[in-house]
Amino acid sequence: MSPEHRPDQHPDVTHFPEPSGQSATRSPSPTYPADSGATAALVVTALLVLTQLYAAIPRLTPISTGLHGSATVALSTAFSLTYAAGFLIWGPVSDHYGRRRTMALALGTLTISTACCALAPSLPALAALRAIQGLSASGFAPVALAYLSEALAPSRRAGAIGAMSTSFLVAGIFGQVLASLVALHLGWRWFFPLCGGLLAVALAAVLAVVHDAASTSGPSGSSLRGQFASLGRLALRPAVVALSLAHLTLLMVFVAMYTGIGGHLESQGMRPSTIVLIRLAALPVMFLSLVAGRIAVRWSWAQTARLGFGVSALGMLGEALLAQSLAGLVAGSIVYVAGVALAVPAMISLYGQVSAPNRGSGMALNGFILFVGTSAGPLLATSSPTFRTLALTLSGILAVALAAITGFKALADVDR
């Protein structure tokens, strides 16, 4: 095998040593306390947490009507901005105080604030509650990813990250569909107490099955100020800047596309129930996240990310060219989502690798960049005059992301 193709020469592939005499199915130990039960609990909880973000997309119209004004800022932007900012807080905090207690605090606050959203009498009140929701919700995903990256046996980590990535993506469809059905049959306010109850159950499950690895069960040797300083140094590395430029676009484009497609289909006379089915069309390809790890073993995580961004750009271009054809629009959205399904676990893994051993900080930066982009998605969609214009704009953004992830690989080689 030539040097340029040796896996150990690539900075974007992590190689975990297999513990001697132990298999991937061994019982949990103080070093690797996570088992399949902990993974399953975190995957389901991730679905519920991210549902709070994506459920805003189909509820903009009913909440705007019910509270007499545009709900875009109160429902979407307030949540997304605090969700993004919260990542920068929770990641270093979990590096210092431990994953389990950080997740417990975040999920407890999220459960209460979610239920309280049902009582919001006005858009400003809803915006304040959604901001609290976003800040508390951001304490789950980066901490859970960091936990799985250190508390699972090394040979099981890629599969767990793939499952979490699938959950993040499925939430994009599940949240929209669940919110649409609740709004249609019960009213938009009922969505919040329903989710509050489910989150309370999830919190109990996480407390029951999640146990910190021995090395992260308490305050770390580094001060909390030191953890934040390391996060700042990480963010300024040239390779990470290129990685972040690509990552910024990932959910920005996803949210913008699904926000825009709803209005586009409504303008063509589609019934809400039909739009729900169209939103569901791309659900099966989201499970491609589960095979991203296998592709990365053969190629690398950076090449898997490039493949994902390339496929998603082609799918989005197809949506632009076939915007007036329902079949073409659905086909393009499926191709686009397939690319996203490959890119998400690849990007998460790349952030985990460049940030080791401070993976909480790495996942914090990953989430912050990702959801800053998400907060811009609805604004981008509502500012475009037509869906075709929106899709063409999003295609160009994805092309820039593809170039950035290509630049990341070159810069990562220099950083070594």
List where the protein language model places each region.
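Conserved MFS/SLC helix-loop-helix module at the cytosolic interface between two early adjacent transmembrane helices
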Residues: A85-P121
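Helix-to-loop junctions at the C-terminal end of transmembrane segments
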Residues: F87-G98, L288-W301, P385
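Helix-loop-helix hairpin linking two adjacent transmembrane segments in secondary transporters
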Residues: P154-S155, G162-A208
